[in-house]
Every structure is written in C-alpha cells, then in structure tokens.
Amino acid sequence: MTKIQGIRSIRVSLPFETGGPRHGMRPSLDAWTKMESVMVRIKTSDGLEGWGEAFGHAMAPGSEAVINQILAPMLVGRDSVAINHRIAELERPLHGLGRSGPLMYALSAIDTALWDLAAQRAHLPLYKFLGGESGVLTKYASLMRYGGDTDAVAQNVERARSYGFKTIKLHETTIPAFRAARNAVELDDKICLDVNCPWTVAEAREVAQEISEEGFHWLEEPIWPPEDFEGLAEVRLEGVPISAGENITTLHEFKLAMETEAIDNLQPSVTKCGGISKMRKIISLAEVYPVTVIPHCFYWGPGYHATAHLAASCLIPTPLETAFITFAVEPHKLFDSCSDQLTLDDTPGLGFIANWDELDKFIISTDEVNAS
C-alpha cells in the first residue's frame, strides 16, 4: 500500500495588473488587486508529490481551514491509490459542512492531487492517462471587470485580439460595455458575457431581449440565485445561449440543470465540484444532453493545469479559459495570458512546477500534517 505521508497547504496571494480600472466581480471585491490560490501538496511513501488546488479568491481562508484542520489529519497514513474510496469516505460523513463551499473546494484539491500521483505512477501526462490524445489547446481570454468603462473594455478586447484570441469573455454588466466589445472585434470573433449572477429573472430576460440579435456567444450566470434552473430556462427562451455551472457541485444539480433545459454550455469548476473524479462524471453525464462542456478556469495554480488536462481529454475540442491579467511574477511556465495557444508536454501527471523562487514572497500561510 502506497501511503500518504504528508499533506501541505500553501496559500498564495499573487498581485496582478488588469490593463484597466480595477473593479471586483462582486460588491465585496471593490478593487481586486491580488488573486489567491490554496494549493495542496501530497507526499507519498513511494517518494512522489501530487498537487491540487482548492477554490481560493475570497473563499481561500475557509478552504485552507478545512484542509488543515479536518481533511489532512483524516488522510495522512491512508492509501493514496484508491482515489474514489478516499473522497467518498470523506464526503458522506462530512456532509454536515455542506454539499458546496469550502468542504467541496478542499476535497477538490485532495482529489486532484491524488490523480496527479496516479498519472505519475503510470508514467503518463494526466490528459493521456484520462484517454486524451493531443495536448494542444486553444485558449480564450477572460477579461477582468472594468466597471463599465467602455474605453477600457474596447482597448482590452483589441489587445486580446492582437495576441491572437478569437474568443473573449467580459465580466461587465452593462449593455454599452457589451456593445463596446462587440464593436471592437470582427464578425467571426466571439464575445462572451459573464455577469456573475446580478439580476432577477425578469431583469435578465429584459437584457437578453435587447441583445438577442447582436451575436453574443453566450450569457453566463445572469440570475441570482445561480441554482434557479427554471429561471435560467426562462432567460434562455430569449434566444441568447446560456452558460452556467461553476457554482454547481453535485451530480444531482448538474443533471437537473440539463434536464430543465436551462443551459447551452456547462461550466463545471475542477477546484469547486470535487476535483478530477467529479469532473469526469459530469463530462460523462453531459454526453446524453444537448450541451457543450466548457470548464470554468479563473485561477492560475494546479487547478489551471488540471483544467487544461481535462480539456485535452475531451472528445470534442474544448477551449481553456485564461485570465487576461499580468501577474507580478510568472507563477509557472504554463500560464501565459499573451498567447491563445497552450501545449501540454509529456511530463507525467499534472506537470505543475511552480516558480517558487519568485512565489515564496507572496505566500500568506502554509501548514503541513505528516505521518507520525
């Protein structure tokens, strides 16, 4: 039995530049200046290290606490090979902590790290271990929110196009900003609208009606609460393709979203829903519904690598979301916001090799639980 010898959490807060005015995606993030990641490193008795990432951002303290205080003490000394058994035996007894939120984010990190280890033992990059053939991916640029500043929107859309991006996502919430982006690109370019759950169903329908003939590629999470699938289905009737899924975690809810015909694009997040194991089940489940799986990926740590490998393992080419920002230091060689292409090499596992010489100074906290 290959045992888990140690689990370390590393919380990093990495400063970035947006290329425009700073506005958070939500009211609690008025001026977003740093992107937090909660990484997990699992060491095993065969001398390997596996990496995973829990959803961070404003949720980082909660994800970190669950890893350090609950999951790590329960897992150290256990078998690292039986991935499904490890996660299932934790998810059920801990369900009192919720079926979403920090518990699932923390489990996502653990699960991903265990898959990293499994692929390393098979001497395969994760995407090949999952059945993929090509490690070449097309990315799409995911812009920050510029507070409705139409000049900043147009300038950054044009800048993204200059790097080769043909699909660009906004995080604005106003129609003038939407149109500024649409007018800054060619007809065959795709503009996506991620509005982060700001509207009622009636408000979202009104917006969708107004922009329905303007060729936007999708409207993402237009209503609150995000799990109101019947409401999403109503908005979808206005003719704009609907995307959602980053705030769904259970298979039951993913199935309900598709059965309700609420969405066109399903966007599960590997750092939120339960890691590689749950993502594989979601992708398989979606095959029998008329939806396209496009994983959410607004992060830069091992979760970025995991999403890339999952995208490369899909039968249908899947674009990789990449935050269109400039970090204070290069976190690792795979993250490049100035290129619309990414190629995974043949390094076994995730291939996550962080630039710790530069990242060390941005570590907020770290903790480790080891076998006695």
Per-region residue spans from a language model:
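Catalytic core of soluble alpha/beta enzymes
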Residues: 170, 175-302, 329, 337
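Flexible C-terminal active-site loop/helix
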Residues: 2-5, 9-12, 16-19, 32, ...
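Active-site mouth loops of central-metabolism enzymes
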Residues: 136-152, 195-200, 243, 247
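Conserved, mostly hydrophobic/aromatic
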Residues: 4, 47, 71, 110, ...
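Metal- or metallocofactor-binding catalytic centers and their adjacent structured scaffolds
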Residues: 7, 43-121
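Catalytic domains of carbohydrate-active enzymes, especially glycoside hydrolases
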Residues: 159-168
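N-terminal small/glycine-rich loop or linker at the start of catalytic domains
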Residues: 97, 122-145, 177-182, 186-190
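N-terminal basic, low-complexity leaders that serve as flexible interaction/assembly modules and, when applicable
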Residues: 1-73, 359-372
